């Protein structure tokens, strides 16, 4: 699959091979894409997608992740042919499919609402696509049986959708999408309608199924944890464009923009000034920070995740923040203002003189809180690890 600008001097015969996908929208203007025209509304809905240039490898699990309205579902619908882009091309297996109707594209799709046929049994729902393309009855029966076993519903084939739980219905929708052995599987927020425990269980099942079948998969989600747990690569989107593409570890540990850092997890953010080398000044205090390419003296935002802050017990009342040879040591005295128990950890709000009026939020493990006797009112010392203190240019 390959999406490219209509007027670009490119072909769809990508040298990377038929198993790759390439997605591109023109960068010279925003692209208005009609979503749905509903007679009752009498208006066109538009979603704008811009600067998209993405390649998807064969067998890869990709997540489009971003806030509501960022363009992730629009992009998925364009790939599916449910919305036709006004500019740009989409290629799959070296073939331009930009203007093909959905029925002629090689994909299976699973929606948030399951979209099962309520009047058909589970077996008939799964067999629907195979019957439409005229497969022999014996082949259909064998394929349906295979898929029911694969999704753990071998004994449920003669039931109707209303007789199944939400998680079971989503498995049926997944089996139906996979019945025709598509080259591409599209998942449009498939788990968002399920309760938390079922969602966690089913995301592992979907990932395991995808690995077994080796099908190239693109999933839309706004759930950061879901994307981190399931994806081989995450495409973080914002305001119709791509902010960053990378593995879950790269996205979480090495965000390229402040938006990505803040959207994937949580961050403490401080106005700061770039110092010499790998140092930054927050307030009037010098801290060692991660390597960066920002010019000395630039006004930036310094960010650190609550989970990266390390407690060290009783405060030592070190006012300067410098070690014996004058280097920033990133140890600061802090006062525990509030604590919130969240099961696996305590979310702790700290005040620190070196940070002036800015509160510092830290996540301490239950064991650390017990070992160091941390409680509201405690005077403690915490460390901001150098490699976890990231700098970002101001927007």
UniProtKB/Swiss-Prot annotation:
Transport among keywords: yes
Record-listed ATP binding positions: 66-73
Organism: Rhizobium meliloti (strain 1021) (Ensifer meliloti)
Stretches for region Disordered: 1-21
Assembly: The complex is composed of two ATP-binding proteins (FbpC), two transmembrane proteins (FbpB) and a solute-binding protein (FbpA).
Domain ABC transporter: 23-264
Gene Ontology MF term list: ABC-type ferric iron transporter activity; ATP binding; ATP hydrolysis activity
SUPFAM superfamilies from the UniProt entry: MOP-like (SSF50331), P-loop containing nucleoside triphosphate hydrolases (SSF52540)
Highest taxon, organism lineage: Bacteria
Cellular location(s): Cell inner membrane
UniProt similarity note: Belongs to the ABC transporter superfamily. Fe(3+) ion importer (TC 3.A.1.10) family.
Enzyme class at the top of the EC tree: translocase
Protein name: Fe(3+) ions import ATP-binding protein FbpC 2
Membrane topology recorded in Swiss-Prot or TrEMBL: Peripheral membrane protein
Role summary: Part of the ABC transporter complex FbpABC involved in Fe(3+) ions import. Responsible for energy coupling to the transport system.
Gene3D superfamilies: 2.40.50.100, P-loop containing nucleotide triphosphate hydrolases
Coiled-coil spans in chain: none
Annotated keywords: ATP-binding, Cell inner membrane, Cell membrane, Ion transport, Iron, Iron transport, Membrane, Nucleotide-binding, Plasmid, Translocase, Transport
EC number(s) recorded for this UniProt protein: 7.2.2.7
Catalytically driven reaction(s): Fe(3+)(out) + ATP + H2O = Fe(3+)(in) + ADP + phosphate + H(+)
